[in-house]
Amino acid sequence: NSMEGWVMLGRVQRARGHFEESAEALGKALALSRDDNLSIERAEVLAQQNGGSFAGEPWAIIQRVLTADPHHLNALFLAGSASYAEMNFRSALRFWERAREVVPADSPDAPELDRAIAEAREKMGLPAIPPRAAGATADTQASKATLAATSISGRVTLVKELKGLV
């Protein structure tokens, strides 16, 4: 009755396409140890079991995780995907933009997230924004301000014994 054993069984069953058995095994793992990442994984499996629909329990799980941790990255990704699947592009955009705030520009997830945001904006008839452009500009300005604030200027005079050594 180990949590790790149930998780492994759940993942194997998911890989085999046995979503009902996977959801059951992940549920048993969660009964032994509450873990938000595992809850999100179970929500994905339940949605797969329901033909890709996040209605009902999968959506309730996502909302519960986001209530406990509004910055939970996997929950934000999944909430955006669930909203997009329901053609709620405004909600999808909101979740993905929240995720974008915490995903570093050099993350392997960044391009996928930027594409999802661009698609949602397009579906809503909003103008496209270059990926990471707004954040990069702010970062550049902040870096220049930090450098200016930490610069030191002055004049150094060496004694004649050290002049040849420097």
Residue ranges and their predicted role:
Residues 2, 11, 35-36, 44, 72, 81-84, 106, 119:
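Residue-level recognition of tetratricopeptide repeat
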Residues 5, 38-40, 75, 109, ...:
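TPR alpha-solenoid repeat register
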Residues 152-158:
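A short, amphipathic beta-strand motif
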